[in-house]
Regions:
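Membrane-interface helix starts
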Residues: 59-74, 131, 135, 292-299
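Transmembrane alpha-helix signature in integral membrane proteins
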Residues: 119-151
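C-terminal transmembrane helix and the adjacent membrane-cytosol boundary/short C-terminal tail
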Residues: 199-200, 246-256, 295-330
């Protein structure tokens, strides 16, 4: 028998082991390079995902008839208010006693009222009061209601009980009655009317925010975040608030419509916009005395209020259908 060199026997495994080590090292480097490339591509891919979701949202929105019609009506309201801020055919104090209750003409597109004022100009200027009332009143209600609702959800117990019982007490009174009481205390005027409507909006946002936030607090990821040591307000900011914003957006459109109705009602009763500043509600009040002589005087402001409220409600329903995952699956 030929003797086998022991050095050769021991060197073979070493060569195999070295080759395996080199292969493993190369595979490790390839894996690290692949992970690095994936890490570099992640921001770009994330950006593409966001763009795809946004494009998908707008495709669904354009196929939703209620959202489209509501958006057009709300856009018309904004355009009326914006145009009237820079230009109107006549001013609110331009009186022509020789052209009282005239029908539509080239000089006065929608005729004149009982004081000889141009109805089209008053209608355009009245959109400013309605839009301003809606924006500020909803801002007051949403800002205060969101903070109080989140506080009630994050602090169950006495704090939650005090906040919710106060909201229930405020909701026990009719909306217009509450607004009239507040304007009677603070005085008539557009500013006080807007504040009154905004205060009444607070309890509605408190209830909705508290209920939605409490549902998020009961989810597993919120409980896991608490177990990891995050504080209540950190969890609220990172997890609760992003999940309830779509619901609050839908509610804001509904309360916007309520604010326009409330401002028109207060102005109609004499607690809102004061003459000579125009308001759709004030135009309805002025048209009462000439309702049988010139019924169109009441038609135009009433139609404007109806279309504005209808547009906001359709927009809110469309947003709810588009943002609610349960409704999207149907």
């Amino acid at each position: 028998m030929v003797p086998v060199n022991e050095d050769l026997q021991t060197s073979a495994p070493r060569r195999d082991g070295g080759a395996g080590h080199v292969a493993e090292s190369a595979a490790g480097r390839l894996s690290e390079d692949r992970d690095a490339r994936q890490g570099e591509d992640m921001p770009q891919h994330g950006h593409l995902v966001v763009e795809a979701r946004a494009a998908g949202f707008w495709r669904r929105a354009l196929r939703h008839p209620g959202f489209v019609v509501g958006s057009l009506l709300v856009l018309a309201l904004v355009l009326m208010a914006g145009v009237s801020a820079f230009w109107t055919p006549y001013g609110p104090e331009d009186l022509d006693m020789e052209a009282v209750l005239e029908p539509s003409s080239a000089a006065h597109w929608l005729g004149t009222d009982a004081f000889g004022r141009d109805v089209a100009s008053l209608l355009l200027l009245g959109a400013q009061a309605s839009l301003l009332a809606g924006v500020i009143a909803v801002g007051i209600g949403l800002g205060a209601g969101l903070l109080l609702g989140l506080l009630a959800a994050a602090r169950p117990g006495r704090v939650q009980g005090l906040i919710m019982r106060t909201a229930d007490f405020m909701l026990a009174f009719p909306a217009i009655l509450t607004a009239i009481m507040l304007t009677a205390v603070f005085g008539a005027g557009l500013g006080n009317a807007i504040v009154a409507v905004g205060i009444y909006n607070i309890p509605s946002f408190v209830r909705i925010t508290r209920a939605a936030a409490a549902g998020v607090w009961s989810r597993e990821y919120a409980m896991a975040a608490r177990a990891c040591g995050l504080g209540p307000w950190q969890i609220t900011w990172r997890h609760v608030l992003p999940n309830i914003l779509p619901l609050l957006l839908v509610q804001a459109t509904v309360r916007f419509a309520v604010a326009i109705l409330a401002e028109a009602a207060l102005s109609f009763l004499g607690f809102g916009v004061q003459p000579p500043q125009p308001s759709w509600g004030r135009m309805l009040a002025d048209a009462q005395s000439v309702l049988f002589e010139a019924p169109l005087q009441a038609l135009w402001p009433g139609l404007a209020i109806m279309l504005a409220v209808l547009g906001l409600n359709l927009l809110g329903d469309g947003l709810r259908d588009l943002l609610d995952p349960k409704l999207r699956r149907r």
